[in-house]
């Protein structure tokens, strides 16, 4: 597939993964389709929904560039499918329920040359509080960590990096940090931006049961890090993991 650019502005592919969540998909699609950036491709990957989700996706017509509706092996398998279907130079995952922070978010990121020379460009994420207000959570500086230092909803990845380093679907809860650590270790450059990119749906997969997510993070560190980094990182995971087990979370 040929990577496309319009003038000096890169084409950006937004991938939305969904299954049996028509209301959440509607919220996300409206956010994506309202972006002011001129060259956006929209890819929806529906995991063979059994309700009205695929009907709604089809109702969007040619505003959706690629619609895949078939069974998958979980969210990260579906996200890999979205990357393979994309034709943009950059890819961002805005899954069902997530939205861009503002209509001009993509324009803010790619309206300058701040992304040049980097493989991952990321910003902050906002979460809704009990009153429904968006509270911005700052991303961390790039480093080899025991957990994500940004939310993947707030990150733009070069598509060629995602193709070379896809999500490992063996990690059903923590394939995102597994991927980020592999990118970091192969020397991919990360660029942190001082702006909110996404509003995060806190009902996502890694928020369902925290102990399961922490256990998978532990396995990622054990798999990818050497002894020194294990000694540094594992205590930061085992303490909250044991606390979650005691609390039944």
Q: Which residue ranges define each predicted feature?
A:
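Amphipathic, soluble alpha/beta structural segments
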Residues: 204-213, 243-247
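Residues that form generic nucleotide/phosphate-binding pockets
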Residues: 112, 220, 245
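A transmembrane-helix-recognition feature enriched in membrane-embedded lipid enzymes
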Residues: 226-246
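Nucleotide-sugar donor-binding/catalytic module of glycosyltransferases
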Residues: 1-209
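Catalytic core of nucleotide-sugar-dependent glycosyltransferases
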Residues: 208-231
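Short, Lys/Arg-enriched, disordered terminal segments
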Residues: 1-10, 239-249
């Amino acid at each position: 597939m040929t990577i496309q650019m319009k003038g000096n502005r890169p084409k950006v592919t937004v991938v939305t993964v969904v299954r049996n969540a028509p209301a959440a998909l509607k919220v996300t699609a409206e956010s994506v389709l309202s972006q002011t950036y001129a060259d956006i491709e929209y890819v929806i990957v529906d995991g063979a929904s059994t309700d009205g989700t695929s009907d709604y996706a089809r109702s969007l017509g040619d505003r959706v560039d690629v619609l895949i509706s078939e069974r998958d092996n979980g969210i990260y398998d579906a996200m890999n499918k979205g990357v393979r279907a994309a034709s943009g130079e950059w890819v961002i995952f805005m899954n069902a329920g997530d939205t861009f922070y503002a209509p001009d978010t993509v324009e803010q990121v790619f309206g300058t040359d701040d992304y040049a020379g980097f493989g991952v460009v990321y910003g902050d994420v906002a979460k809704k509080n009990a009153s429904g207000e968006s509270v911005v959570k700052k991303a961390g500086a790039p480093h080899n960590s025991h957990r994500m230092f940004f939310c993947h909803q707030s990150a733009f990845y070069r598509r060629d990096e995602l193709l070379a380093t896809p999500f490992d679907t063996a990690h059903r809860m923590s394939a995102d940090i597994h991927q980020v650590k592999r990118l970091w270790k192969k020397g991919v450059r990360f660029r942190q931006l001082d702006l909110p990119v996404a509003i995060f749906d806190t009902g996502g997969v890694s928020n369902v049961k925290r102990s399961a997510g922490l256990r998978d993070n532990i396995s990622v560190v054990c798999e990818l890090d050497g002894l020194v980094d294990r000694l540094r990182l594992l205590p930061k995971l085992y303490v909250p993991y044991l606390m979650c087990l005691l609390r039944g979370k």
